[in-house]
């Protein structure tokens, strides 16, 4: 009864008003799975390729009707009749059908929409919540959230070069209290920014985007907001950064235009180490450019014992690239973005590789999101331990937090919240 009988895709809009792909997978039993794919702003050069139409007369060339057509024709024909429970086989069927290394023929956005919808349909058919379908009956751990409350870089039109300034409520007793903590800090920060005469406009991921003089000033304001909200920085709440350093790495230098700095790899490592000395920073994502593997090694050697060094653009959720990074001692954590690789099976393989290598895994959204909350179920089902899904505003971000609250309620007393223990590989 779990045979696929129909696959339908459509063009919908993401949180930035850009087109994306949504797919429905219908099973013989009558159940349906529906999924929509996200899209990134700062992207790794080796990510799987999302297919855009390039027709300037529609959506400024960003339409996805060709990807939709690929789902409704080639992909549909290839997987109708297959058992939705056979996720890996279906994913491999689509990979083989595409025939490229980066899913550029059919589009990673087309393939991923179907991959996710198949899983949702199979879970529904099994009578299991999605997180249980992913993780089985083993004990479930709720993820510690990375909450992006100040935006810079490609996510905001301001003077900050570092892309995300985040809080992590490690002192909370459960995910519900962690989300409350983040929300209270978010509102305290809004009042504080207003008081200081800064803009409270928000960026793509719902964080504030004030024009501040330096990254240290942004971190200091967050520290103040944490205290105003009634929490203790460094105890209840830790800080995290996503530098997205590839975006300001030019001609072999890290060019921090907002601070008028042009730094070598070693100097930028010193810069980040200085911030980590001044503030309770527990995680730095993409601290170096994806093109600067030597810089990554410097950063890992300098801070990797006490700070989570997360690879996003450098690893792009790709096990072949990630395996190379592990061998070279690059980072100690991987960011997991489902649309970077384009199928759930490959995503899950990257998480498993991280666990075997002693790396942490952070399940992540993209800056262009939808109401789809699949990543919340992935974070819990795979016991990833961490999730990064934006700020405490914009319903595309809140959808994931609300799903985590529902999952924790469903799990009851069996749900654990790791807090600081999520950083098991730090000293």
From Swiss-Prot:
Where does it localize?
Cytoplasm; Secreted; Cell surface
Q: Example GO biological process term?
A: glycolytic process
Q: Which UniProt keywords apply?
A: Cytoplasm, Glycolysis, Lyase, Magnesium, Metal-binding, Secreted
User: For this protein, what is any one GO molecular function term?
Assistant: phosphopyruvate hydratase activity
Q: In which pathway does it act?
A: Carbohydrate degradation; glycolysis; pyruvate from D-glyceraldehyde 3-phosphate: step 4/5
Q: Where is the active site?
A: 205 (proton donor), 337 (proton acceptor)
- Sites binding (2R)-2-phosphoglycerate sit at 163, 337, 366-367, 388
Q: Which NCBIfam families match?
A: eno
State what protein this is by name: Enolase
Q: Which organism is it from?
A: Dechloromonas aromatica (strain RCB)
